[in-house]
Amino acid sequence: CIRDRLNSAREGHSLACVMVDIDHFKQYNDHYGHPEGDACLASVAKALRDSVRRPGDLVARYGGEEFIVVLYRATEAQVQQAAERIRATVEALAIPHAGSPLYGRVTVSIGQACARPQDRHASVHRLIQQADEALYQAKNRGRNRVWPLTVECMA
């Protein structure tokens, strides 16, 4: 559970939250229909699970077309690598997306944030909020990219 992982951050281990959002998913559903939208969600979810395989890491659907990935005991470099691997893996699925004004295929935007071992005031809400803010920046900067809010994770 994410709360258990956050407690681990308080005990001297880093914790990262990676928010993943499918770009222009409403347009995908509008163009292809909800059954294809559901299939797209399932394919993206599998790509996330395949990209994140370390013990203790979690992948979950957060709502709508958003997913959350919790990386336990990861360095900043490992978080960045995992997020970029997720982005590239989804793009490599090459799922056609006629409703995407930029890429013509399904892509994701990713925001990441870290709870540092020394952050005694970390909370699940704050960590998710920071990752969501980073996701917003990724979308504002053109989508299909990773945006880190902090670079202070340490194992």
What spans do the regions from the language model cover?
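Conserved beta-strand cores of small sensory beta-sandwich domains that regulate signal transduction
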Residues: 16-18, 60, 111-113, 147
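HATPase_c (GHKL) ATP-binding subdomain of two-component histidine kinases
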Residues: 69, 106-108, 112
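Conserved long alpha-helical elements within nucleotide-processing catalytic cores of c-di-GMP signaling
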Residues: 2-16, 23-50, 60-64, 68-72, ...
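Catalytic-core segments of nucleotide cyclases and related cyclic-nucleotide turnover enzymes
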Residues: 72, 76-84, 101, 115-155
